[in-house]
């Protein structure tokens, strides 16, 4: 796919070497720009519980998370997953970032969201996220597009099959298998409306687990793309013009919504969401105004709307849910570059209720403090 690819065939013989009981743990975290960082360390035995994982640290001045004169930021493990690249007993460790004074780093939004989910545990809130993304080559051209030109207009690419309709299916398939190996609740993939735009779905996941699994899924996608020599973009409108943007549609349900008669609770939730539209939009991704225009299967950012089977609405109720009278709803406003902890957290806050020691809007504002 590109001359700038990793020599994975050469690497294979080293991956088969005996590690003599040692385990490699790749710690991953979210930096100040909402990007992923990682570094590896050696552990002396197989890990059975997250409590066995040591805390670690990194240079926060190099990631925009701390000043140079006080640069140590601490990594507190919160979950771990089988590593599909190193395999064996090797693991990927998802970690929260903490300051040396014992407070969560201002880019650590997981900590605040977790408070809400714990407080509303009885609601048994489920999420499913539809992560759209676009693939580029190393020269920042959309992968597979004519150099200096454009492909045919949108139409044949969504869920397309065949050369000229889909690009980089090998990347997508490799990522799918990597997610399954890691134990993520990846529920599907499909080619999207714009050529070289794809989507993977994760969920249903309960509470804070949703954000965890989406971040790990993104990490795996970037790592797979490295090996194929392509770049992954989560920008919500990577190309101007008559091309679809990229979102992260968020499917939501509580226990009450999933039971017979649940439509009543779905409608109540939508009413609550309508009253906090502006607050939600602030947390629904940067540059989202380029995507939420009322065109290309989006609602206008300026207004809130809902409807059955309406992909031009802010909130969509699936036709099957409307017919059966219970199930879930889809919030179509979130952009592809969201922090899932902010989005799932504020949705929980809005439909289940605010709590005294957590506020997702204020949590987001901490970034600029």
Swiss-Prot record:
InterPro entries: Gln_synt_N (IPR008147), Gln_synt_N_sf (IPR036651), Gln_synth/guanido_kin_cat_dom (IPR014746), Gln_synth_cat_dom (IPR008146), Gln_synth_gly_rich_site (IPR027303), Gln_synth_N_conserv_site (IPR027302), Glutamine_Synthetase (IPR050292). One of its GO terms (biological process) is ammonia assimilation cycle. GO terms for molecular function: ATP binding; glutamine synthetase activity. Keywords: ATP-binding, Cytoplasm, Ligase, Nucleotide-binding. Residues 109-369 form the GS catalytic domain. One of its GO terms (cellular component) is cytoplasm. The keyword ATP-binding applies. Its EC number is 6.3.1.2. It comes from the Eukaryota. Belongs to the glutamine synthetase family. Homooctamer. This is Glutamine synthetase. It comes from Eremothecium gossypii (strain ATCC 10895 / CBS 109.51 / FGSC 9923 / NRRL Y-1056).
